[in-house]
Amino acid sequence: LRGAAAFEEWTDADTLVYTAAAPAGENVDRESMAVEEQDRTRMTEVLKQAKQKGMKTVVLLNISGPVEMADWLPYADAVLCIFIPGCMGGVAAARLLTGLAEPGGRLPVTFPIRYEDTPAYPNFPGEGNDAYYGEGVFVGYRSYAKRKLAVQYPFGCGLSYTDFSVELCENDFRWDMRTQETLNVPVRVKNVGSRPGSEVVQLYAREEKPHMLRPDRTLVGYAKVRLAPGEETIVNVSVSKKALRCYDARMDKWVQPIGAHKLYLALSAENILAQAPLMIEGKNPYPLNGESTIGEILENPRAKEIVNQFTNGMFDMIPKETLDFMVYRKLNDILSVGMIQVIPDTVKLSAILQGLYDRLAEL
């Protein structure tokens, strides 16, 4: 149903298909997340009337990006987001709706509940000719996860005409980046439905103790698998080093974090099926030195031991309650003040501290 077509003309049908639009383009940004005006004024009412008549209702979203759906979604039995599919989009949509083809795609964006929920909302459209991108690293699904904000449909979401069981084949992962370029994560997938179909297995990861502000989880790998009814397979989802890199503005370069991570098996950014620890080994982009915090030193048993050797057991002498208040203090600040009283010769003290920092950098 579209344009001037009258709903009354469709009273002999058992299913109503409503196509809604929300066009946009380069230099034609939308001012809201609403569908077109003609759809906004009649869409909810038409769907509501169809449901009252006992009809099935389907909404085709011929859109350029996410739209608000709260007003009409309760009256839609199914929603097929075709975005802007081109001149053969109608044929493709018909094949999908009639079951001749399967909707195997997954959302490349998040559909928020309200326009005001979007991470760009406070800064858009900017002032004059200036547009301020204030989201930082929290773009898209990363922002909603960080704010623990409910969404209409999450990034990576999508259905097919069958069901799948998806599970990790292992429950613990180690990755030595010095010898392995990629990490292969085996996932068992089975089509437990009655039709052939496809599933997109997604892997997200988070660094347990990041050195900077990081998203709660980031997509690091995915794989699409198509299976017949009852068919089962193991798919290896490949994770590259690049997928785990992050940019450190203080160091003005890309860094490769190592250490403890969490790996998430998911079917969307919000539909987490399982999680497993991931320990990454490699060259530390943040070698321990005088600029390291007391907390970072204490997290490394070997580093704590080295500091104790150079300071006659400093960490063993300081009460735990006091150490808890010092975790964010820099090691150099603590040692410079504390050791100058014992070693007033600044040249000798500097040599001792440099020796300590050299030992820490070797870890």
Predicted segments, located by residue:
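C-terminal non-catalytic regions of proteins with extracellular/luminal or membrane-system context
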Residues: 1-363
